[in-house]
A protein has these predicted regions:
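In a subset of proteins, long, contiguous C-terminal domains/tails are tracked
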Residues: 79, 84-116
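Aromatic (often tryptophan-rich) hydrophobic motifs at membrane interfaces
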Residues: 1-89
Length: 116
């Protein structure tokens, strides 16, 4: 693999924020995911003077690396209208659980939130 690309991460830059969205690899290496998706993104933000890095939704491993759990939104296209009501009910119920999980996950950050 020497000198060959074995992984890539896709980032988008908008305003003062870098957004990490997708990644893939051809071979597995310890910590490659973190290097490609987080550490290189952080380094780019510092070099480019960006004030925010949004590494994407999900992934409890992000909390250990100091990424605060934040709410995000998604859109769903439901082809068969018969599922619309069931999906809407589930989404409404899930909302409370997601908010509770966000608060619980924030307690796992390697630093304290709020003013000193």
């Amino acid at each position: 693999c020497a000198g060959e690309a074995v992984a890539a991460a896709l980032f988008f830059e908008g305003g003062d924020t870098l957004y990490g969205r997708y990644w893939g690899c051809l071979a597995e290496f310890d910590y490659l995911h973190f290097e490609a998706c987080y550490y290189r993104g952080i380094e780019y933000c510092i070099d480019a003077g960006l004030s925010r890095f949004d590494p994407g939704a999900q992934g409890e491993h992000k909390i250990q690396r100091g990424f605060e759990p934040v709410l995000t939104y998604s859109n769903h296209w439901i082809v068969d209208e018969r599922f619309s009501d069931a999906v809407a009910r589930f989404a409404a119920q899930e909302c409370d659980h997601v908010r509770a999980y966000q608060q619980e996950a924030a307690t796992l950050l390697p630093f304290k939130l709020g003013s000193p």
